[in-house]
Amino acid sequence: MLALCGILALAVLGGVYGIGRLRSNPAAAACEPAVATAGRVAPLAHGEVAALALAHTPFLVPVLAFKDAEGHARTLKDWRGHTVLLNLWATWCVPCRKEMPALDALQRELGGPKFEVVAINIDTRDPEKPLAFLKDIGVTHLTYYSDQSAKVFQELKLAGKAFGMPTTLIVDRSGCEIGEMAGPAEWASPDGVKLVSAAISSPDGASAITQ
């Protein structure tokens, strides 16, 4: 009887965990193409973008809520169908300030219907300060996005994708991570442009994700 109970218990546990496996995160499964893209662009992660950590496991980037320059609510989901270089920055972050011209230049060179640099400012106090800073350094190609609550950083931190500033993620057309960068980079350098161009042109990343 005890042996039979043990067998039944194992069967029940196996059934439960089997169901769990069958119901594994569909978003993660849909992000497999982004991992393939990461593998494809990995040989280009050198020189000025050598610190880019390419995705080895599927990860759907949180939707993230922020605002545009007019104060309209936006989420990262608005960019489904586009490859995105997502960057979190602040005026109090010296490396962020130094990186902004390169991000602006990358948007000038590659920005269009297939790609955008989405740089989100997370200053929590004076909302005019980052705008004045961007004007002072001559940034003209980046669209201004902000989150004065800094929740976008906290969400990425909880997901293990943000540890400091600046934080940058390359996100594919389905909202899945291709790679992440902790710290600044010369994104408009030949190394950066070549890598991002390869990510944009990748045939992967067309899986439909509804969440």
Briefly describe each language-model feature range.
Residues 83-84, 115, 166:
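Alpha/beta-hydrolase fold active-site loops
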Residues 59-61, 79-81, 112, 128, ...:
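Extracytoplasmic
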Residues 80, 88-105:
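Conserved redox-active cysteine motifs that mediate thiol-disulfide chemistry
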Residues 132, 136-141, 147-199:
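Thiol/disulfide oxidoreductase modules built on the thioredoxin-like
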Residues 1-61, 208-211:
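N-terminal targeting signals for export/organelle localization
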Residues 53-58, 63-84, 209:
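A short beta-strand-turn-helix
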Residues 197-210:
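Short, low-complexity, Pro/Ser/Thr/Gly-rich segments in the mature regions of secreted, periplasmic
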